[in-house]
Amino acid sequence: VPVMSFLVAHPRGRLLFDTGVHCQARVDPIGRMGPERAKRLIVKSREGDDVVPQLGLLGLKAGEVRYVANSHLHFDHCGGNEFFPRATFLVQRAEMEAARRPGFAPGYNPSPLDFDHPLDYQLVDGEHDVFGDGSVILFPTFGHTPGHQSLRVRAGKGADLVCAADACYTRENMDRDVLPRILWDA
């Protein structure tokens, strides 16, 4: 499954939805993910595929991102968090509480190496209107993890774009009610 990040440009600032896998996981998977996870998961990205170089292709620096919203705190969605020290991070309170309490949610074991940095985390409860104008909304889609959230962006002309992250991998999965392979509760 590809790991994607989404950049939203708004008049009041930029929001990045998910930061992907840490670049170290590509060159030292055991050191970054541990032997068990490195054996199960193969990182296929190439140098330059990480979120910061991709922003560079758009002429942007990490410091120009005002908000980072993590869909959840698995390594493939928050691995690049540390590269955005000036951003405000928007994470569901239930997600952060579960992540910081090992064993609290059976089967849920995010790595503190990916999310536990001295960053400006703003914990949200439920739906959150990022810019206060209804154009960029975070909303809970619990199931994959205790506090998974998705992103809805008003795209204009009555159309919305939804970034579901690991709540639903494809449109076909949604149409057929196929659940994600990894579930905390469903």
Cite the ranges covered by each PLM segment.
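Active-site loop-helix segments enriched in His/Asp/Glu that coordinate
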Residues: 75, 82-83
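Short acidic/His/Gly/Ser-rich catalytic and metal-binding motifs that mark active-site loops
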Residues: 24-29, 98-100, 171-175
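Active-site flanking residues adjacent to catalytic metal/cofactor-binding acidic residues
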Residues: 17, 71, 91-92, 143, ...
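Metallo-beta-lactamase
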Residues: 22, 41-76, 83, 88, 92-142, ...
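Short glycine/proline- and acidic residue-enriched helix-loop micro-motifs
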Residues: 34-43, 110, 175-178, 182
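Conserved beta-strand hairpin/beta-sheet module of binuclear metal-dependent hydrolase folds
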Residues: 1-53, 150-167
